[in-house]
Amino acid sequence: MSGIPFVRDLEFKYGAVAQVSPLVRRVVAENPGPFTYLGTGVYIIGRGDVAVIDPGPMMEDHFEALKAALKGERITHVLVTHSHMDHSPLAHPLAKWAGCKVYAAGSAIPSESEVRMEAGDDLRFAPDVVVKDGDVFKGSNWTIEAITTPGHTSNHVCFALKEENALFSGDHVMGWSTTVISPPDGHMGDYFASLEKIRKRGFSTIWPTHGPPITDVAPFLDAYITHRQAREQMIIGRLKAGDTLIPKMVEVIYKDVDKRLHPAACHSVLAHVIHLVETGKVKADGPFNLTTEYHPLAAA
């Protein structure tokens, strides 16, 4: 049902540094998986004085690959899009090695779910400097702007490279898949607002942390938003059909998906249901969880 023009082909070699644009290099960590796709792509911005975006997992071979890629250069900023285990654990070791600071939009809210979502929360992570929307970081030949994008997590932030009109999107937008939104740290209403915020900026290229770049940005973001809206209409349809419990909805909506993924799908549907309650389309009989019953309202 998605209609999203996914891009999934990426030529790379684990641990090798690749020049992917005039100002951007990438090193991919060897941590492939169902949520990380081919692995965590670490971006190095500039030459000489550089910024590093999403250093990735704490893997010794990956750390050594980054050191080799950065030999003879000076890291001025370590930038983290959000505190998940595939993005942030190497941030402080890398910053300590380089003698610089770690910048991010705060720490994570611990998950209340027993279902492992993505690589897990990096609960030990806290930035040296908390970034705010619109903060600007400069190097000798690059300018990066922080754009706060809560939704996937409460502390998610993207980074815009002004010289190339490019966005480093973390997990906010991914070319190979849709993004996981898992309450309470994930919030669908915030996610919709953050997608629209990015769409209005008119970026030429989006570089997700996982997978290849998105180069046809406007149609891709439109499809991303339309997919989420269609999912909410499907949920309303199931509620009107009498499926008042989220697990029952998931059995129908995700009938063609591996049942082992249904627990994670339940949390995605919960995020949508919370948004529908907040926008006056659905009523909850209790707290927001998987055992509460939900009902459509006239506005739906």
Predicted segments, located by residue:
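Short, structured coil segments at secondary-structure junctions
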Residues: 20, 97-98, 202
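Metallo-beta-lactamase
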Residues: 50-52, 57-59, 114-128, 136-138, ...
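C-terminal regulatory/interaction regions
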Residues: 3, 237-300
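Residue-level signal for inorganic ion chemistry
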Residues: 23, 66, 210, 235, ...
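Histidine-centered divalent metal-coordination motifs
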Residues: 79-87, 152, 210, 272
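Active-site HxH/HxHxD metal-binding segment of metal-dependent hydrolases
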Residues: 38, 57-141, 165
